[in-house]
Regions:
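Sequence/fold signature of self-assembling virion shell proteins
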Residues: 2-46, 53-56, 63, 67-69, ...
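Structured, hydrophobic secondary-structure cores that serve as assembly/anchoring elements
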Residues: 59-60, 67, 80, 87-117, ...
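Membrane-topology and secretion signals of cell-surface/extracellular proteins
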Residues: 70-71, 75, 87
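Short, polar loop/linker segments at the starts of domains and inter-domain junctions
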Residues: 75-80, 262-264
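Alpha-helical scaffold segments that mediate packing/assembly in large oligomeric complexes
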Residues: 106-186, 325-329
Length: 329
């Protein structure tokens, strides 16, 4: 063969592909983040009160006291002590939430990627999503709790302009958040207590790009000017409106779940007009008897590995006056 002649190497990667692909038989490198669905972020875990239960306990009792009073003393009168209204909130755990899958030996052996780790990650995310959904359901139910004198009830802000339609109004939402803050103030919620608001991404985007009557951005300009606000680099995962941290979530209920069998019974309600929820950390609490854990069992008779991921928690109302539901009707 002359030095300048072209050779004909065996292209053993092309297989019998049609059209010819010289890399058909070569394996791809699979990463967990690439193959699995995008993580639906759990935004509530660090934003409300969580109490761990010990084994053998089914519920946690939270004492509740009303405000103390003061009065002027009349000379010569005896101080007998004022009455202080007290109550308690009892939060019980739900049933054990599970996610379970079996992986057959033949599929695992023939697979050229680690299917086991992918499935286990997805199982954990499935539990986290239900946890998030139930926290939002409980927050909304807290906002619907009636007053039990002297303790105030929850707060509802209803405005048709808050609807998550084709063109949600960011300006209306900014005004609604301000209105909710006034209601919290009138309920004697401390001004220095952290406040959160969760909305669908469409409403979050409308708030982020809200403009005033002159077409000037009300939030976006501030995001560009401050590194801590998010801006372009961080995609503004959180924006602050009137001291309230606004986050976006896909886990809020927005349909009528009154008879939805897959929803745990105490969280079933009509959420068809719900468009957002705002809360302080003490509005609700979560009792956790068992954190997310993964168990595996070898089933020799079926030649498979059986995976179970489980979570044992429950949610309940603590202070309904700290929860606000935003409704479109």
């Amino acid at each position: 063969m002359a030095l300048g002649d072209a050779s004909s190497p065996v292209r053993f990667g092309k297989g019998a592909s049609s059209p010819v692909d010289n890399r058909e038989l070569f394996l791809s490198v699979f990463g967990g983040e690439v193959l699995t669905a995008f993580d639906s972020a759990t935004v509530t875990l660090d934003k409300h009160f969580i109490k761990n239960l010990s084994g053998g306990a089914k519920s946690y009792r939270f004492p509740k006291t009303w405000k103390a009073s003061a009065e002027y003393h009349t000379p010569g009168s005896e101080l007998l002590g004022n009455d202080l209204s007290t109550s308690e909130q009892v939060i019980t755990v739900d049933d054990i939430l599970v996610s379970h899958y079996a992986i057959s030996d033949i599929d695992r052996i023939l697979s050229h990627f680690d299917m086991r780790s992918i499935v286990s990650n997805e199982m954990g995310r499935a539990l986290a999503k239900v946890f998030d959904q139930n926290v939002f359901r409980q927050l909304i139910l807290a906002s619907r709790t009636a007053a039990a004198s002297p303790f105030p009830g929850g707060i509802t802000v209803t405005d048709a302009n808050l609807a998550n339609d084709a063109t949600p109004s960011g300006l209306a939402w900014i005004q609604a958040i301000r209105e909710a803050n006034i209601s919290l103030f009138n309920n004697d919620v401390p001004e220095d207590m952290q406040r959160y608001c969760a909305v669908p991404v469409e409403i979050f985007d409308a708030i982020k790009y809200a403009v005033d009557g002159n077409g000037q951005y009300l939030v976006l300009n501030r995001d560009f000017q401050a590194d801590t606000a998010g801006g372009i680099d961080a995609r503004a995962e959180m924006i602050k409106i009137d001291g309230v941290m606004v986050v976006k979530s896909r886990n809020m209920p927005t349909t009528d779940e009154s008879s939805t069998a897959t929803v745990f019974s105490k969280y079933r309600a009509d959420y068809s007009t719900t468009v957002g929820v705002m809360w302080c950390p003490q509005a609700i609490a979560t009792c956790k008897l068992m954190d997310i854990s993964l168990e595996t069992e070898r089933d020799v008779r079926r030649l498979e590995d059986f995976l179970v991921s489980k979570l044992f928690v429950g949610h309940g109302v603590l202070r309904p006056e700290m929860a606000v539901e935003f409704k479109s009707a």
